[in-house]
Design a protein with these regions (language model features):
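Phosphate/pyrophosphate-binding loop motifs in nucleotide- or prenyl diphosphate-using proteins
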Residues: 1-190
């Protein structure tokens, strides 16, 4: 367990932040942008958990929050360092478990007949918001991967997680009054 006795260190006052291997990276760089986006995604998943508290039988989003923390640690550990052998990395079984959860949730849903809007209730919208923020985290991680070596399972995890949240939002909508379908301009009568 990590113990933090002091929250501020002043070491980041120069615009850098420490990585797992002890090196420092600029806060506006691609690595820390990706780590920050994953942190924001984790917060959005936490908001979704709060909104879904009254519903039962849903996948364990608390586990996903822990895995997003792991993913941030993964991105904070550059490849090719002495710390790599002990790095916390996202692994294929984590991605595969998310895929199984997607398949299980999707099995009970009607096929999509239209694009759906991220609305209908606070719970539905909160899951869609988390999905969109996870997509942004994925784009930031892909930008990091274009610049430096990253764990490809971490990229796959983010990609699947956004799909997972999309299907979860559909499950919540099915329990919570139905999906709000997109009506293209010509069909709205505007």
């Amino acid at each position: 367990m990590v113990k933090l006795n002091k929250i501020y260190t002043r070491t980041g006052d120069d615009g850098t932040s420490g990585l797992v291997d002890g090196s420092r990276a600029i806060k506006s760089g691609v690595r820390l942008t990706a780590i920050g986006e994953v942190d924001e995604a984790n917060c959005a998943v936490g908001l979704a958990i709060a909104e879904l508290a009254a519903l039962t039988g849903l996948p364990d989003l608390g586990r996903i929050q822990n895995e997003l923390f792991d993913l941030g640690a993964d991105l904070a550990t550059p490849f090719g360092t002495d710390f790599e052998a002990h790095a916390l990395r996202i692994v294929a079984p984590q991605v595969e478990r998310i895929e199984r959860e997607i398949d299980a949730m999707n099995a009970d849903l009607a096929p999509l007949a239209s694009f759906i809007l991220p609305s209908g209730s606070r719970a539905i919208a909160s899951v869609h918001l988390a999905r969109a923020i996870v997509r942004r985290a994925e784009r930031a991680a892909v930008a990091l991967a274009a610049a430096e070596q990253v764990n490809l399972h971490a990229l796959a995890y983010l990609n699947r997680l956004s799909d997972h949240l999309f299907v979860l939002a559909r499950v919540v909508a099915a329990r919570d009054g139905g999906e709000v379908l997109w009506q293209p301009g010509a069909t709205r009568g505007d």
